[in-house]
Amino acid sequence: NNILTIFYAGGNKLYADSITVLKLTKVINDVLTRYKVKSNTFVLGGYSAGGMIALRYVELCNEFPAKFPIQPKGVFTVDSPIDIFSIYEQLEESARNNYSELAVEEAVRAMGYIKEDHGVPRENISTYAKLTAFSMNKDYCQNEMFLKNMAVRTYHDVDIAWRIVNRNQTVHGSNYEVIAELINRLVLMGNDRAEFMQSFQTGYRSNGQRHPHSWSIVNEVEFMQWMKGLLK
């Protein structure tokens, strides 16, 4: 397809803090210098937390164009948690309910990563409002305004039964509940290129394990056609 693909490893970061933004900018500057590509021919995206980081980075590119090296054409997320405030509340609920041992372990670990950085989000709203890509609570921030004119795609395997059986969680514990609100707000702003890409039972890990939180939920052929259309 003649498309240069760059992978960036963000470690355990769940959002685009100043260090992550700086590192990603360095990678992009290196790409611009090394491969002589145009600064307006980038599509950013990521899986899980990588999607949160990509989404926030694109927002920052649009909010502060003079401070960032590229003008992205589009952004995509793959079952990404994008609202740090909602994420933390969902994690607290999972740990408190104790419905699933695995869900509790995941929740405690993720809450630890968050608290180590800037504490509990609702107790430090001003800081986390600058880090999160989106907030269900408009009083916290409305960073989605910087995606108003951007092509945005979010991918999800909407298998509610799997969540109930394997995690004892409902739709409320899903990433797509929050993402649907993001896409709806963008559509209400007049963005006809904001798309919620829904599939069903498409998620499988590389070892064949059924899991809706997987890269495989993206239709690769159709995705490439979408991206090539943006880069024309």
Where on the chain are the PLM-derived regions?
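Conserved alpha/beta-hydrolase
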Residues: N1-Y15
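Solvent-exposed loop/turn segments at secondary-structure junctions
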Residues: G11-Y15, S48-M52, S80-F85, S135, ...
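Alpha/beta-hydrolase active-site loop
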Residues: Y15-K36, R56
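Short, solvent-exposed loop/turn and secondary-structure capping segments
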Residues: D17-T20, R56, S86-Q90, V165-R167, ...
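Short, proline-enriched alpha-helix->beta-strand connector loops that line the catalytic pocket
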Residues: Q71, M145-R153
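Mobile cap/lid helix-loop segments that gate and shape the active-site cleft of serine hydrolases
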Residues: Y88-M145
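C-terminal catalytic histidine-bearing segment of alpha/beta-hydrolase fold enzymes
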Residues: V152-W162, S174-K232
